[in-house]
């Protein structure tokens, strides 16, 4: 099967992301098994990068 319109129609059945148990954001990928926001399921440590300081400062989040 190709990668066109027909396969894309199957993406509406199950959600790609569900609510994360650790951070509470809707960023836990069901297929991959880890959270895109905090890294839960991939590592025990919280996902953090130096380039995301501005975003965290705006939302009053600390490490």
Curated annotation (Swiss-Prot):
Pfam family, one: Ribosomal_L37e
Keywords: Metal-binding, Ribonucleoprotein, Ribosomal protein, RNA-binding, rRNA-binding, Zinc, Zinc-finger
Protein name stated in the entry: Large ribosomal subunit protein eL37
This protein's record includes keyword Ribosomal protein: yes
GO MF term set: RNA binding; rRNA binding; structural constituent of ribosome; zinc ion binding
Family statement: Belongs to the eukaryotic ribosomal protein eL37 family.
Cofactor: Zn(2+)
InterPro entries: Ribosomal_eL37, Ribosomal_eL37/eL43, Ribosomal_eL37_CS, Ribosomal_zn-bd
Binding positions (Zn(2+)): 20, 23, 35, 38
Co-factor binding details: Binds 1 zinc ion per subunit.
Biological role: Binds to the 23S rRNA.
Zinc fingers (C4-type), renumbered ranges: 20-38
Organism taxonomic ancestry: Archaea, Methanobacteriati, Methanobacteriota, Thermococci, Thermococcales
One of the record's GO cellular component terms: cytosolic large ribosomal subunit
GO aspect biological process, one term: translation
Domain of life: Archaea
Assembly and binders: Part of the 50S ribosomal subunit.
């Amino acid at each position: 099967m190709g990668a066109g319109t027909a396969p894309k129609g199957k993406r509406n059945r199950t959600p790609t992301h569900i609510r994360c148990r650790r951070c509470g954001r809707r960023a836990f990928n069901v297929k991959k098994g880890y959270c895109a926001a905090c890294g839960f399921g991939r590592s025990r440590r919280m996902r953090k990068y130096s380039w995301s300081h501005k975003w965290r400062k705006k939302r009053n989040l600390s490490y």
